[in-house]
A protein has these predicted regions:
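Outer-membrane beta-barrel domain signature, strongest for Gram-negative TonB-dependent receptors
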Residues: 210, 234, 240-387, 404, ...
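Outer-membrane beta-barrel translocator/receptor signature
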Residues: 124-125, 137, 148-157, 162-230, ...
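Solvent-exposed loop segments that connect transmembrane elements
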Residues: 228-236, 275-293, 337-347, 388-435, ...
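Membrane-embedded beta-barrel scaffold of Gram-negative outer-membrane proteins
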Residues: 310-336, 535-551, 558-559, 566-657
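Gram-negative outer-membrane beta-barrel transporters
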Residues: 371-373, 455-459, 596-598, 618-709, ...
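N-terminal Sec signal peptide and the immediately downstream disordered periplasmic leader
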Residues: 1-98, 205, 257-261, 313
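Extracytoplasmic beta-strand/coil segments of soluble accessory domains associated
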Residues: 60, 92-133
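C-terminal beta-signal and adjacent terminal beta-strands/loops
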Residues: 4, 691, 700-707, 727-774
Length: 774
């Protein structure tokens, strides 16, 4: 089988005294800041291994297998070894430990380099892939992203539009599950913790036909009691139950040399809280005694199914043909309490359906000087979302005042009368129902190549010609269900005006009714990539790449107006410097990326004035961001290794265009929401007395603002410490673990400074686990 990446054996170039001087300062620099994707000691053929050599890590997220040191893209890799060492159980455990990546609303949403995966428009800016299948962003809080039987997780930072295509302007997260092997193997694990969160898991595989057909199955079950109690309903607010089941087949037929096929099916069934799990902070000791008083259940019932078929055929040592087929089907029912109180005033239910089918064909070439791929991609996505809810619309004082001025009143009188009306009717209760359907078809031709201009200098290039057809339609009904103010109660002089306001209010509700026939839009984009990579010696390489990022346009539904509104694509140009280095005879890896991104035609949400629901997406923003990531890992010896990461990201809105009739805040000079400037992580593994192991790691995130603008409130910085200690043999492991070891209290999100409702970070969790392997 040909190797799709270059692993040439070269004479080592002696390091200069200057290089040694730089090296001598690296441990202090890194401990004061840097980074890392975990690596483990390489094993010699006899199994003894080199206790101070790090494993070669392969990065596959760019669809060509390259070593981490050959990859110029900024990527953080978490292997199955690190998942076990740190007792990582969910994708967000990894994101919280990754440089320039941060959580947003608890387990709902994340940022990469300060860019939110969901921002400004329905389609995401970053996508999570499971075995090559793109997961809908709407299930990031309740999808199949737990880490049981996961082989590797790659967080690709920066535009991935050339290779991944749609919805990857900020980056991509690639999860690969464990493949079947031609040997019998298995593992089983049980975990228990306080607060109660029991988990049980099993994975096993074996050959069905020796050397030709093998299978692997994995199952995990969880029954979490939750952190938040609800005295109104007498239940837990954020309890979760989930069951994940996966089956995989590997086929390498003896009669077809060079052919391999992997078939995977995952079913993930979850019952849990709504995407945002709020607690009240207007109660004593709100961090330790978490309370939610909602009378209406805030819940999610999600069934996600993912199937993939990957076929590789090595026609020769140089040529390989790959076919990747994926299908995802997600059914989701959610309910929520909008007012978050014990009063039955505002609540709702949604039914959501997401279906995606994609097919990709790639031709890989690996020659002496030229390596790369060319591919064809096609996908079809369908969504069907329905909602029924009781909504309390804040009485729009400014809109009423404008109507009164249009009728001839002066501004002062109109404002005073509008204020009196709002006192009588502070909110407008509306029964609202809607259904929106969309279908998108994406076709693309793409290529990614590396050509050796000399023994050490390589040209990097690629492109994607992307075509998307998007169709969206919606229907909505709205009905006023409250009691209007009695005009007679305001006296004979004001009664006519109050009656007129009543009619205007009913007209506003009526305007939210609408039937919008499906409309189709087509987008084309050319996304180039060009760069250079120079290998100074076998252990040191630098690179520079410029590439274009892209998010397609589409249509959004304006609830208040009952209409669709179109918006156009947005683009970025990304320039990135990379450093890849190994030191101390490959015991220390130090990698870094420095980037600058220019963002044009940014998709933002604009208000149009009727009420709080009169908004839709427009292209009005221009922004830029810059920063760096540094990552290091060092195996000091058989008994100790450490790793660290440091990220810095500075985001800035530059200007906002004027949109007719729109109310767009001029955020020029402001930072993005949930864009921490600094992220830092450090950890280490200790081994002693043959069988004892321990891991301790800490993560830091600087302060962030959940809003945008000079007066936006900020959430304080937070530092979390986690640990694991255990006893390991060849067959079994018993261990203790703790997350948020010092029980640091921190807020993930709040409506505003005065709001009693907040999303809190997880408290300290202490538990035990046992795993058996065969």
């Amino acid at each position: 089988m040909p190797t799709p990446f270059k692993l040439e054996s070269r004479m080592r170039v002696p390091r200069t005294r200057l290089a040694l001087a730089v090296l001598s300062s690296l441990p202090m620099v890194v401990l004061a800041g840097p980074v890392s994707a975990q690596a483990v000691p390489a094993q010699a053929p006899d199994g003894a291994g080199n206790a101070t050599t790090l494993d070669t890590i392969l990065v596959t997220g760019e669809k060509t297998a390259r070593t981490l040191q050959e990859t110029t893209t900024s990527v953080a890799v978490t292997t199955s070894v690190r998942i076990e060492q740190e007792n990582l159980t969910s994708l967000f455990d990894i994101l919280n430990r990754t440089a320039n990546v941060s959580q947003m609303y608890g387990d709902r949403g994340f940022t990469i380099r300060g860019i939110a995966n969901e921002a400004g428009a329905p389609n995401p800016l970053a996508t999570i892939y499971l075995d090559g299948a793109a997961l809908p962003s709407q299930v990031s809080d309740a999808g199949p992203t737990d880490l049981w039987d996961i082989a590797q997780v790659e967080v690709l930072r920066g535009p991935q539009s050339t290779i991944q295509g749609e919805n990857a302007l900020a980056g991509a997260i690639v999860l690969r599950t464990e493949d079947p092997t031609m040997d019998w193997s298995g593992r089983a694990r049980v975990m228990a913790s306080n607060p109660p969160d029991p988990r049980s898991a099993f994975a096993a595989g074996a050959p069905l036909v020796p050397d030709q057909l093998a299978f692997r199955v994995a199952v995990e079950d969880r029954d979490f009691d939750g952190y938040i109690r609800n005295p109104t309903r007498g239940t837990a607010e954020d309890a979760r139950e989930s069951t994940m089941a996966r089956a995989k087949l590997l086929w390498t037929p003896a009669g077809i040399d060079g052919l391999s096929a992997r078939l995977s099916y995952t079913r993930d069934d979850r019952d849990g809280p709504y995407m945002y799990a709020y607690s009240r902070r207007d109660v004593p000791d709100y961090y330790k005694d978490r309370i939610n008083t909602s009378d209406y259940p805030s819940a999610s019932d999600v069934l996600a199914q993912v199937a993939t078929l990957e076929v590789d055929y090595a026609a020769s040592d140089a040529w390989t043909l790959t076919s990747a087929t994926s299908w995802t089907d997600t059914d989701m029912a959610r309910s929520f309490d909008t007012d978050l109180t014990e009063r039955p005033e505002a609540y709702g239910d949604t039914d959501e359906f997401y279906d995606t089918l994609s097919q990709e064909l790639r031709l890989h070439y690996s020659g002496q000087r030229l390596r790369g791929l060319v591919g064809l991609y096609g996908s079809q996505r369908e969504t069907d979302n329905s909602s029924v809810n009781r909504t309390n619309v804040d009485t729009p004082v400014s809109t009423i005042a404008a109507v009164l001025q249009g009728a001839g009143l002066d501004a002062a009188t109109a404002g005073q009368l509008a204020g009196l009306y709002a006192q009588a009717l502070p909110v407008i209760p509306v029964d609202y129902a809607s259904r929106g359907t969309s279908r998108s078809r994406n076709l693309a031709l793409f290529a990614d190549v590396e050509y050796d201009l000399s023994e050490r200098l390589s040209l990097l290039g690629g492109f994607r010609q992307d075509n998307e057809e998007y169709r969206f339609g919606a229907t909505a009904t709205a009905e006023f269900v409250g009691t209007l103010p009695d005009p007679a109660a305001f006296g004979p002089m004001l009664a006519p005006a109050i009656a007129g306001i009543n009619q205007a209010g009913l007209g506003m509700v009526q305007q939210a009714n609408g039937v919008t026939p499906g409309s189709t839009r087509v987008f084309d984009a050319f996304l180039p990539k060009l760069g250079l990579r120079y290998e100074w010696n076998d252990d040191l390489a630098t690179g520079f790449v410029v590439q274009r990022g892209y998010r397609s346009g589409g249509s959004t539904y304006n609830i208040a107006r009952g209409r669709n509104f179109a918006y156009d694509p947005e683009f970025t140009w990304n320039g990135e410097l990379s450093l890849r280095s190994q030191w101390l005879d490959d015991a220390l890896t130090l990698n870094a990326n420095l980037y600058y991104i220019d963002w044009q035609d940014k998709q933002v949400t604009a208000l149009f004035g009727i009420n709080d629901y009169d908004y839709h997406t427009v292209n009005a923003g221009k922004a830029h961001l810059y920063g760096f990531e540094v990552e290091a890992s060092h195996r000091v010896g058989a008994a100790f290794d450490w790793y660290s990461s440091l990220g810095y990201s500075r985001t800035r809105y530059d200007e906002f265009k004027t949109i007719v009739d729109a109310q767009i805040d001029d955020w020029a000079g402001a930072e993005f929401a949930y864009a921490p400037r600094w992220t830092f992580a450090v950890g280490g593994n200790v081994r002693w007395a043959e069988n004892w192991v321990a891991n301790l790691h800490a993560t830091y995130r600087s302060s962030v603002s959940p809003g945008i603008g000079a007066d936006a409130r900020r959430l304080p910085a937070r530092t979390l410490v986690n640990g694991r200690v255990g006893y390991e043999t060849m067959d079994w492991t018993a261990y203790l673990f703790a997350s948020n070891l010092f029980d640091e209290g921190y807020i993930q999100y709040s409506w505003d400074d005065d709001s009693p409702n907040v999303i809190l970070g997880a408290p300290r969790v202490v538990g035990i686990g046992f795993e058996y392997r065969w």
